[in-house]
A protein has these predicted regions:
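Conserved alpha/beta-hydrolase "acid-adjacent" motif
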Residues: 130-136
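Core-facing hydrophobic residues within beta-strands of well-ordered domains
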Residues: 20-21, 147
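Short beta-strand/loop motif that positions the catalytic acidic residue
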Residues: 117, 123-125, 129
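Hydrolases whose catalytic domains are alpha/beta-hydrolase-1, hotdog thioesterase
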Residues: 8-12
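Flexible "cap/lid" loop of the alpha/beta hydrolase fold
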Residues: 14-15, 21-52
Length: 177
């Protein structure tokens, strides 16, 4: 699961482990994780910056502001437009608000006992995630017994999109192992 989807994936792995053969958590963190409850203020400021600069907010939310990060943001947004038919619609404003509310609530929860997750787990993130701070990926890894951690350099919340080819190769190898 990516981001909020990673929260859901952790819940499933804890509550119905028989349904999960392998777990991949990206750009996510544990309940009560450091800084997760700050997503509201981080997101709004960067969404406003996107409006002011006439740029997609993903430039600021998912990628670093280095030349490498911005090049990756351009490439990612271009890839998103490649699919011409049956494209998913973006979230409505009310759905986006509900997502932020759910992420904030997750960040304020009591931590769960992730040592109960016995499923082999691949955890990936960028080294500069400002939405779900990177320290939370390391925190998950320390608490889940069977884990592999990938932290991409000069990458943010969208690290798996920035280094997509490398991530897919590693994810497939993990799933095949």
């Amino acid at each position: 699961g990516f981001s909020l989807g990673g929260f859901v994936a952790q819940e499933i792995a804890l509550k119905a482990p028989e349904l999960v053969r392998k777990l991949i958590l990206t750009g996510t963190g544990p309940a009560g994780g450091q800084g997760i409850d700050k997503v509201w203020s981080v997101s709004w400021l960067l969404m406003l910056k996107g409006l002011i600069t006439f740029r997609d907010p993903k430039f600021y939310l998912f990628f670093t502001q280095s030349a490498n990060g911005q090049k990756a943001a351009h490439a990612f947004l271009k890839r998103l437009k490649e699919r011409k038919k049956e494209r998913d619609k973006g979230p409505t404003p009310s759905a986006f608000l509900r997502q932020l509310k759910a992420i904030t609530a997750w960040g304020r929860q009591m931590p769960q006992d992730l040592s109960l997750i016995k499923t082999p787990t691949l955890i990936a993130n960028g080294d500069s995630d400002i939405m779900v701070p990177t320290v939370n990926s390391s925190g998950c890894a320390r608490r889940i017994p069977d884990w592999k951690l990938i932290i991409d350099e000069d990458a943010g919340h969208g690290g798996i999109f920035q280094y997509h080819a490398d991530f897919v190769t590693k994810a497939l190898a993990f799933l095949d192992s």
